[in-house]
Every structure is written in structure tokens, then in C-alpha cells.
């Protein structure tokens, strides 16, 4: 069994495509079931965040699994495969393990060292567990990935002074306004990203925090944390003009704000500029807003350019983290290889035991032996089988740790005619 990853991220695909292939919590269970119905996919997990959609799979045929999944991702979102597949990457075996460990440790994140991705990966794993789409391989892989991420965060400085997407958004606002003191902000959404943004905004002196959310009670709870004000999502249009800075991160599949709403808000503001940051995928803010005078719209792709400075500053910590990952990757591969060899070794031993039992049954019946002598013969036969099987099975177990270990398993199966039955 091999580990396979097929996906796209902020480096391989623009936000306009990432939002089209994103998975919502409502559709995820159905998609996980459909994924594991693909012929070459034995286990599957879907990781869908604002910056990536990745399919983690266990398969005996990595090439077939990758090909089937690449087509399936497009079909599952009613897209033309020709528009999706050029942006996909495929990783298998040790490369897939290394990539997954890097993702969990935030080395592959847009913001190097951010903490959100580990929680998102844990949630993706829990969703797959609930859907029954994981098994022995992915269960072990994700547990190993989480332990590796923990080592990276505790043994390196990767998490020190790291920024999040939310804090990067606030830094962008500071570049536009300079001093944020005296400015007001509106958060559309009440999840973790918006809460993080609110904390950074208040730290930098924002005078008023407004919050709206589809679930009004959550908006109230978040606003109260910052002595702010909440209003129902239905009142968004009539309140938009109150904000100098708008940060949006919801799970909506439709635009929350369009150009006409912004034009009306600017009219009420007497054309004072309004700064909008969309950190949602799919996007909350219609891209056409960027064409409106005095409205300055930024999305995840814009933030990606801004946080590159942070990535360069953290290169030394990233190098130390990669050393940990390079050490953990072969450990998982070795376990995976032994997983493949165990059934073969069991079959070899069962075949030897069956031959022993057949011979004992044939000959002992014609021998006039006491119970004690019969027991001695049976013990001798058992010891002989164990002795003869010990070296071949232990050697086979050892050889499977090599890069071409599969061929030794195949050879053993042919020599012992394990697939002839």
C-alpha cells in the first residue's frame, strides 16, 4: 500500500480556481464517500482550506489513483478537467509523506509558521474518520504527521513571532492607512480568522469593531470580546459605510458584498476610501469591487505576495524544521513497507504449517506411538518449520525497508506460489 497526494495550493493555482474546488462542511461527507469508491483508492481524506485543497489517499496503484482523482476533483465540482489538472500536483510514497509532514508543520503554508493549518488538518482527519473513509494507512500517517508537527513547533523557532493570514491582513491595512488609531473596522464572519484579525486590529488602535455573521449570536459573542457592536447579516448593506476597514471570512458560497453595495456605502461616506480584505475561499467579496473608485480590494493572492518577506526571515528555522521532517519521513515509509510484507510472511508460515500438518496426519496414523512419543514428533516438526522459516521471513522483512523492497515481496510470493491458490 502506498501514500498518494493530489492537490493544488496558493503556489499552483489562483484564488479564482481554489474557490471553485473548495469543499464545504455540508458536501464533504458525500465527497469522501465518492472518493473511496474510485477503483484505485482504498482510503481517502480531503483537506480543504483557504490556501489548498489536497486529497490524501492509500492505494496499491499510485499512478492509477492519481489519474482517477485528478479527473474526479474536476467532475465533483462540475468543472472541465482541462481547467483544473494543469494546476494539480501529484506526490507519491516518500515524497507524499514528506509533503504531508511539511503541510502539518506549516512549512508549506503561505505564512510560514502559522498555527491554523495543524488544526485544519486535524479537523480534516476527524471528518474522514466520521465518514469511515480512513483505514490503517491514513490513521497511522496523520498521527505521525501530528507528532512531527509537534516536534517542529517545540524543537525549532518556527512558531516564534510567526504571523497568520489575519495578522498579514492587518499589516496590509497599516500599509494603506499608516496609523490605524481612530479608524473603524467591520468583520464579516465570526470564526477564528476574524477573531485573530480583531485582536490584531485592537492592538494597533482601531477605535471601533463592528461584527456581523449569519449566526447573529456568534457575532454578538465576538463583538463583546472587544467592546464592539454586532448587527444581523441582513443589515450589512445599511451598515457597511460605518467601516474604514472590512475583513471578511465566512463559509458562504455566494458573494456577501458586491460593487453596488460598496458604491452606496461610499456615497454615504462622501467618497472617503474604504479598504476591503477578503480572506475567504470561496471569496466573500465580488472581485468587481476592485473597479469601484475609492474602494481598495485585496484577496488571498495579494496577501501571498506580502508575506514572502516573512518567509525569507524564517529560512533558518525552516531549515531546522526540514531536518526533523527528513528524519521522520523514512520512519513512516519503513512502517508502511512492513505493512505490505506482513500478509506475505503470514501466508508463507501458514503454507509451511499446512504442509507440516498434512505430513503428520498422513504418517502418524500408521505409526504405533505412545502419546508421549507422538507429542515429541509433533514438537520436532513444529521446531523444524520454525527453524526453516525464520531466516527467510526475517530477511524478507529486512529487505522490504530498501527502496525496491516490493520486488522482494513479489519474488517471495512467486517462490512460495502464494498466489496460485
From Swiss-Prot:
The record marks 99 as: Important for activity. The keyword Oxidoreductase applies. The active site is at 50 (nucleophile). Pfam families: GlutR_dimer, GlutR_N, Shikimate_DH. Keywords: NADP, Oxidoreductase, Porphyrin biosynthesis. It catalyses: (S)-4-amino-5-oxopentanoate + tRNA(Glu) + NADP(+) = L-glutamyl-tRNA(Glu) + NADPH + H(+). GO terms for molecular function: glutamyl-tRNA reductase activity; NADP binding. Pathway: Porphyrin-containing compound metabolism; protoporphyrin-IX biosynthesis; 5-aminolevulinate from L-glutamyl-tRNA(Glu): step 1/2. GO terms for biological process: protoporphyrinogen IX biosynthetic process from glutamate. The keyword Oxidoreductase applies. Substrate binds at residues 49-52, 109, 114-116, 120. NADP(+) binds at residues 189-194. InterPro entries: 4pyrrol_synth_GluRdtase, 4pyrrol_synth_GluRdtase_dimer, 4pyrrol_synth_GluRdtase_N, GluRdtase_dimer_dom_sf, GluRdtase_N_sf, NAD(P)-bd_dom_sf, Shikm_DH/Glu-tRNA_Rdtase. Possesses an unusual extended V-shaped dimeric structure with each monomer consisting of three distinct domains arranged along a curved 'spinal' alpha-helix. The N-terminal catalytic domain specifically recognizes the glutamate moiety of the substrate. The second domain is the NADPH-binding domain, and the third C-terminal domain is responsible for dimerization. Belongs to the glutamyl-tRNA reductase family. PANTHER family: GLUTAMYL-TRNA REDUCTASE. Catalyzes the NADPH-dependent reduction of glutamyl-tRNA(Glu) to glutamate 1-semialdehyde (GSA). Homodimer. During catalysis, the active site Cys acts as a nucleophile attacking the alpha-carbonyl group of tRNA-bound glutamate with the formation of a thioester intermediate between enzyme and glutamate, and the concomitant release of tRNA(Glu). The thioester intermediate is finally reduced by direct hydride transfer from NADPH, to form the product GSA. This is Glutamyl-tRNA reductase. It comes from Magnetococcus marinus (strain ATCC BAA-1437 / JCM 17883 / MC-1).
Amino acid at each position: 500500500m502506498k501514500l498518494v497526494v493530489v492537490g493544488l495550493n496558493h503556489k499552483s493555482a489562483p484564488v479564482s480556481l481554489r474557490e471553485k474546488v473548495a469543499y464545504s462542511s455540508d458536501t464533504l461527507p458525500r465527497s469522501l464517500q465518492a472518493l473511496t469508491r474510485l477503483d484505485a483508492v482504498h482510503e481517502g481524506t480531503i483537506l480543504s482550506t483557504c490556501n489548498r485543497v489536497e486529497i490524501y489517499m492509500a492505494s496499491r496503484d499510485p499512478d492509477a489513483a492519481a489519474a482517477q482523482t485528478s479527473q474526479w476533483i474536476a467532475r465533483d465540482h462540475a468543472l472541465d478537467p482541462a481547467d483544473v489538472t494543469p494546476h494539480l500536483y501529484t506526490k507519491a510514497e516518500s515524497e507524499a509523506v514528506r509533503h504531508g509532514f511539511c503541510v502539518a508543520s506549516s512549512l508549506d503554508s503561505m505564512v510560514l509558521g502559522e498555527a491554523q493549518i495543524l488544526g485544519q488538518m486535524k479537523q480534516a482527519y476527524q471528518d474522514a474518520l466520521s465518514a469511515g473513509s480512513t483505514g490503517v494507512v491514513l490513521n497511522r500517517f496523520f498521527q505521525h504527521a501530528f507528532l512531527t508537527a509537534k516536534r517542529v513547533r517545540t524543537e525549532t523557532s518556527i512558531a516564534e513571532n510567526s504571523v497568520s493570514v489575519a495578522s498579514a491582513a492587518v499589516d496590509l491595512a497599516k500599509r494603506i492607512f499608516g496609523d490605524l488609531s481612530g479608524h473603524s473596522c467591520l468583520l464579516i464572519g465570526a470564526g477564528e480568522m476574524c477573531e485573530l484579525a480583531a485582536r490584531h486590529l485592537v492592538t494597533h488602535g482601531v477605535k471601533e469593531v463592528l461584527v456581523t455573521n449569519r449566526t447573529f449570536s456568534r457575532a454578538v459573542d465576538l463583538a463583546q470580546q472587544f467592546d464592539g457592536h454586532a448587527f444581523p447579516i441582513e443589515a450589512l448593506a445599511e451598515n457597511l459605510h460605518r467601516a474604514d476597514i472590512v475583513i471578511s471570512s465566512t463559509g458562504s458560497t455566494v458573494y456577501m458584498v458586491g460593487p453596488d453595495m460598496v458604491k452606496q456605502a461610499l456615497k454615504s461616506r462622501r467618497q472617503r476610501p474604504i479598504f476591503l480584505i477578503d480572506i475567504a475561499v470561496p471569496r466573500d467579496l465580488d472581485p468587481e469591487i476592485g473597479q469601484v473608485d475609492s474602494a481598495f480590494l485585496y484577496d488571498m493572492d495579494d496577501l501571498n505576495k506580502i508575506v514572502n518577506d516573512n518567509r525569507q526571515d524564517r529560512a533558518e528555522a525552516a531549515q531546522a524544521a526540514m531536518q526533523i521532517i527528513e528524519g521522520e519521513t523514512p520512519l513512516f515509509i519503513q512502517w508502511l513497507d512492513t505493512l505490505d510484507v506482513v500478509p506475505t510472511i503470514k501466508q508463507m508460515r501458514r503454507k509451511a504449517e499446512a504442509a507440516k500438518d498434512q505430513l503428520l496426519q498422513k504418517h502418524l496414523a500408521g505409526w504405533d506411538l505412545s502419546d508421549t512419543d507422538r507429542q515429541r514428533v509433533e514438537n520436532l516438526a513444529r521446531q523444524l518449520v520454525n527453524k526453516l522459516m525464520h531466516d527467510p521471513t526475517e530477511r524478507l522483512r529486512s529487505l522490504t525497508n530498501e527502496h525496491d523492497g516490493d520486488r522482494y515481496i513479489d519474488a517471495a510470493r512467486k517462490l512460495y506460489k502464494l498466489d496460485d491458490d
